[in-house]
């Protein structure tokens, strides 16, 4: 199974995502914002996939993804957002984004998408 780095500023959502992903057999690292994502990567965490909240304090998931893509990272990415329709702020066209999940999270759909992207 995959090692997934999950970032969200809601502790509840992080706990739910960690629990559901681990129940599906994945290893999960969590971050409270985009800066923590970058810190994990700098500390040697090498995820098979990123699951990033679009909007977080300090550094958004989009900003963290932009930095990782500019550094050559090619891992699959799912963006999570409270917005029902992805706009440029949530899913900018200049970044390679593999999927978009809306809140409230449909965990069955999330797990299906993760399985497809990490197969």
Set out the residue ranges of the language-model regions.
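Charged docking surfaces used in two-component/phosphorelay signaling
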Residues: 15-23
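Active-site beta3 strand of CheY-like receiver
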Residues: 45-51
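Alpha4 helix (beta4-alpha4-beta5 surface) of REC/receiver domains from two-component response regulators
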Residues: 63, 84-101, 112
């Amino acid at each position: 199974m995959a090692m997934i780095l999950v970032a969200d500023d809601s502790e509840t959502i992080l706990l739910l995502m960690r629990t559901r992903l681990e129940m599906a057999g994945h290893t999960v690292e969590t971050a409270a914002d985009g800066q923590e994502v970058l810190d994990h990567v700098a500390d040697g965490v090498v995820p098979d996939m990123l699951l990033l909240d679009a909007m977080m304090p300090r550094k958004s998931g989009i900003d963290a993804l932009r930095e990782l893509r500019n550094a050559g990272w090619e891992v699959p990415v799912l963006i999570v957002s409270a917005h029902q329709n992805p706009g440029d702020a949530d899913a900018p066209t200049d970044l390679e984004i593999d999927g978009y999940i809306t809140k409230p999270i449909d965990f069955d759909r999330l797990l299906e998408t993760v399985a497809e992207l990490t197969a």
